[in-house]
């Protein structure tokens, strides 16, 4: 099974360096031809490890994507909305209480939300009494404001994670996208000013369950790592690889579109923006098995042809075509010139269409120009037909090409996920079933003495009170003066009573009562 796999992946991997799957390999450079004996013929070694000179194989661990198609990476979270319910009461002179209820919003703090979620983790989600109006208190001639701050948490709220830039996608975000959760920013803004979205687990990498650990063999030459043989025995070359992070995990995107995370000392550049990785589903794996079977068949055909050559001691152009190297890289090229078996060093490249190597009638393009033929013979079984057309034996079989085209059409890139509008709440679901309300202590604020009047009323009342007070003062002053006036008259009469005398009608002098008393007393 290992040789089969080693045939498949170099062919696919190195062909993808050119962006497409190959149908043929053609030398770009041909060394000088030299005659050889028939026993020097051999089937090509399609192990790319030897081509790169990396013959040192050592076991190591690496991380790769899981087998199977990944449609979307779901991240569970919740939305949190801050609601302030306020009750305002006023009690007038006679004790009549007027109550006004108000509801406002506030932007919740992420730290408070996580603490509340942890406290209420074991409880069933429901709408609690805190959504109702708070029980108001009252004081005579005062305004009392009683407020309740509630955190309304709606869970679950599912979003899609983009593995390339760790951005989140959902219809609850502005523009349906959140730039991602970082150390400094643990939440995402939503379309509501007072509602934020937060993941259940801050580390988004734990939600990205698309990796698996594997064991393989590292192919190296000194300190340089050329590639590795994966857990299934497939060789992966690091030539042309670039660095790419998936879900925040650094790794390498290989030229065949696969992604691996492994330690290497090679200097590798970052992938350009928008670079994607390929995933294969089970259908693609089945097609790969078809390609493997076809390549194994070609390997067996090469061995059969070589056995036939050594047994019969005869060589034909058709048999030489089986000795062609199937993957890009260094190898051998064979031909027959003037009944002499010839060999040359060659470096092969992949070919996508026949027009690349046969641009016109009678022209076989090698190294940018038409390769000369010797009496109608080129190399690797390629000859010039009687009508002047170039004939390639592999052009007669299209089965491998059909399999490769199927495989190419089945390559699935891991695209940026699109938020499904039905992932948050499906039709018929009741949001109340997912609501948790977390209520801190009730806040109560008592104002000073308040008469319950508007500003102009307070001024009128103050003016009237001042006028009444002034009138009351004037009244009191007036009353006090009236009380003091009789007392002053009596005092003046008492002070002059000893000097008063009365003259009777007879002309006699009648002294005052005091004089009369004193005189009478003395007379007696």
UniProtKB/Swiss-Prot annotation:
Q: Which residues lie on this side of the membrane: Intravirion?
A: 481-524
How does it get modified after it is made?
Glycosylated and palmitoylated by host. Glycosylation is crucial for glycoprotein export at the cell surface.
Topology of the protein relative to the lipid bilayer: Single-pass type I membrane protein
Nucleotide-binding as a keyword? Answer: no
Regions that span the bilayer:
460-480
Task: Spell out the subcellular localization from the entry.
Answer: Virion membrane
Those parts of the protein on the Virion surface side are 20-459
Q: Name one GO cellular component term.
A: virion membrane
Which residue intervals are annotated with compositional bias (Polar residues) in the record?
489-507
**Which residues of this chain are annotated as glycosylation sites?**
56, 266, 338
Q: Where is this region: Disordered?
A: 488-524
Record GO biological process: entry receptor-mediated virion attachment to host cell; fusion of virus membrane with host endosome membrane
Q: Lipidation (S-palmitoyl cysteine) at which residues?
A: 480
- A Pfam family per the record: Rhabdo_glycop_CD
Leader sequence residues: 1-19
Look up the further comments and give them. Answer: Arg-352 is highly involved in rabies virus pathogenicity. Its mutation dramatically attenuates the virus.
Q: Which family does it belong to?
A: Belongs to the lyssavirus glycoprotein family.
Listed name of the protein: Glycoprotein
């Amino acid at each position: 099974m290992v040789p089969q796999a080693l045939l498949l992946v170099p062919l696919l991997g190195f062909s993808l360096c050119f962006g497409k799957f190959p149908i043929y390999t053609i030398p770009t450079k041909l060394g000088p031809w030299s005659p050889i004996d028939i026993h020097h013929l051999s089937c090509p070694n399609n192990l790319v490890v030897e081509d790169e000179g990396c013959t040192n194989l050592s076991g190591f661990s690496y991380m790769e994507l899981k087998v199977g198609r990944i449609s979307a990476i779901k991240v569970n979270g919740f939305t949190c909305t801050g609601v302030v319910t306020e009750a305002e009461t006023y009690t007038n002179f006679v004790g009549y209480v007027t109550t006004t209820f108000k509801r406002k919003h506030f932007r919740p703090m992420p730290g408070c939300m996580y603490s509340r979620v942890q406290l209420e983790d074991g409880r069933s989600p429901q709408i609690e009494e805190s959504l109702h109006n708070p029980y108001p208190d009252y004081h005579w001639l005062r305004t009392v404001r009683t407020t309740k701050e509630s955190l309304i948490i709606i869970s679950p709220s599912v979003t899609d994670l983009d593995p390339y830039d760790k951005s989140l996608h959902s219809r609850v975000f502005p523009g349906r996208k959140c730039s991602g959760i970082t150390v400094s920013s643990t939440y995402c803004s939503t379309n509501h000013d007072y509602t934020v979205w937060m993941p259940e687990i801050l580390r988004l990498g734990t939600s990205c369950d698309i990796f698996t650990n594997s064991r393989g063999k590292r192919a190296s030459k000194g300190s340089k790592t050329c590639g590795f043989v994966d857990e299934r025995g497939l060789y992966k070359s690091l030539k042309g690889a670039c660095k790419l992070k998936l879900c925040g995990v650094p790794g390498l995107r290989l030229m065949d579109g696969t992604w691996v995370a492994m330690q290497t000392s090679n200097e590798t550049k970052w992938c350009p923006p928008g670079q994607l990785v390929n995933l294969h589903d089970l259908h693609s794996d089945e097609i790969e098995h078809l390609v493997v079977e076809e390549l194994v068949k070609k390997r067996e055909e090469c061995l059969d042809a070589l056995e036939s050559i050594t047994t019969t001691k005869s060589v034909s152009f058709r048999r030489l075509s089986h000795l062609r190297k199937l993957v890009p890289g260094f190898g051998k090229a064979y031909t027959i010139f003037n009944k002499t078996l010839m060999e040359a060093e060659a470096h092969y490249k992949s070919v996508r269409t026949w027009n690349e190597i046969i641009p016109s009638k009678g022209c076989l393009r090698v190294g940018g120009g038409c390769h000369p033929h010797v009496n109608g013979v080129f190399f690797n079984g390629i000859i010039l037909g009687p009508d002047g057309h170039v004939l390639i034996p592999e052009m007669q079989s299209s089965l491998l090409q059909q399999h490769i085209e199927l495989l190419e059409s089945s390559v699935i890139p891991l695209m940026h996920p699109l938020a499904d509008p039905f992932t948050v709440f499906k039709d018929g679901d009741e949001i109340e079933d997912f609501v948790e309300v977390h209520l801190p202590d009730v806040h109560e604020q008592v104002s000073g003495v308040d008469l319950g009047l508007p500003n102009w009323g307070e001024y009128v009342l103050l003016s009237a009170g001042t006028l009444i007070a002034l009138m009351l003062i004037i009244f009191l002053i007036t009353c006090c003066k009236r009380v003091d006036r009789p007392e002053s008259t009596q005092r003046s009469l008492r002070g002059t009573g000893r000097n008063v005398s009365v003259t009777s009608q007879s002309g006699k002098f009648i002294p005052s009562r005091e004089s009369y008393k004193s005189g009478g007393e003395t007379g007696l």
